[in-house]
Regions:
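Helix-termination/interfacial motifs at the ends of transmembrane alpha-helices
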Residues: 163-167
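Conserved alpha-helical "signature site"
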Residues: 1-161, 171, 175-178, 183-251, ...
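Terminal helices and disordered tails flanking the catalytic cores of nucleotide-processing hydrolases
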Residues: 1-11, 254-291
């Protein structure tokens, strides 16, 4: 197997023009989102032009989690009901689903893991903000949870044999993290963060993705959201939500996760409780039915 450093991998992908470009609808939506004078109708118009996304927006707006007095029948009403933050989350989820695929990864398990992590990150952010007076934006935490594993799919997509060897030698996800560093001299967190930087996604999301395995290595300003994302990923493993290339074992708790919990005197049981709440929210939102 060829040993590659993270910088070499990114350089090679760029040279071969293989780094995925930001999906068109997501690009339009993010550009409109950054406009301080953005209007909900402008965002609704962007969504409506994409059949796949607009259908999912409608489905989610009429789901158990969001359904109000009656069924919404138009995209404008659906976006109004969901709000622009929830709409943005769905645009990201659907756009990225078509971008991040690999024959080495079970797509259904991968996206179930990612969406559950997104809802878990939101829950954990709210909890940490309340307990420790942190100021993690729950919406940014949701996106970080959704995107945290994207680098793994890039590795599996563009370096199939290398990824397969790492996976074969890893019975747990902790082992996978160790092996990708030892054998590839890089990790999926760095690769995913680099891609999202090229897409000009929010800086705090990029930092959260980059540091979701080692939050303490991230600048102090972004430690809280990186830590939240770290726990969100760990929460998924606690409730059996594997990531599509390493199976979850609810009877085995990651030593790395236990160490992270200890940093702020959190307990495994409470994290599992938040994870179950997040899992219930993800199921009632209808987002899991997207994939």
């Amino acid at each position: 197997m060829t040993i590659r450093k993270s910088g070499d991998i990114l350089t090679e992908l760029k040279r071969l023009n293989r780094l995925p470009e930001i999906p068109h609808t997501l690009s339009l939506f993010e550009a409109a989102w950054k406009n301080p004078t953005k209007h909900i109708q402008e965002l609704a118009n962007i969504v409506e032009a994409d059949t796949a996304i607009s259908q999912r927006i409608m489905d989610t707006a009429n789901s158990i989690l969001f359904r109000g007095d009656g069924k919404v029948l138009t995209i404008s009403n659906a976006v109004t009901r969901l709000g622009i933050i929830e709409t943005r989350n769905i645009v990201h989820a659907i756009s990225l689903h078509s971008t991040f695929t690999s024959p080495l990864i079970d797509a259904r398990k991968f996206w179930r893991h990612s969406i559950t992590a997104a809802f878990a990150a939101k829950k954990i952010a709210e909890y940490m903000n309340n307990r420790f007076k942190w100021q993690v934006d729950p919406a940014m935490a949701f996106l970080a949870g959704l995107l945290h594993e994207a680098g793994s799919v890039l590795m599996a997509r563009f370096f199939l044999r290398d990824f397969e060897i790492v996976r074969e030698q890893s019975s747990t996800f902790d082992a996978f993290i160790d092996n990708e560093s030892k054998l590839l001299h890089m990790n999926h967190a760095v690769l995913g963060a680099a891609l999202f930087k090229s897409w000009d996604l929010p800086h705090e999301v990029i930092m959260a993705v980059a540091g979701h395995h080692h939050p303490a290595r991230i600048h102090a300003d972004h430690y809280p959201i990186a830590y939240v994302t770290c726990l969100a990923e760990g929460a998924c493993w606690l409730i059996g939500e594997g990531n599509g290339f390493v199976e979850a074992n609810i009877n085995q708790t990651s030593q790395h996760l236990l160490e992270q919990l200890e940093k702020h005197r959190l307990t495994r049981d409470h994290l599992a409780f938040l994870a179950k709440q997040a899992q219930a929210d993800s199921e009632s939102s209808n987002m899991l039915g997207m994939f």
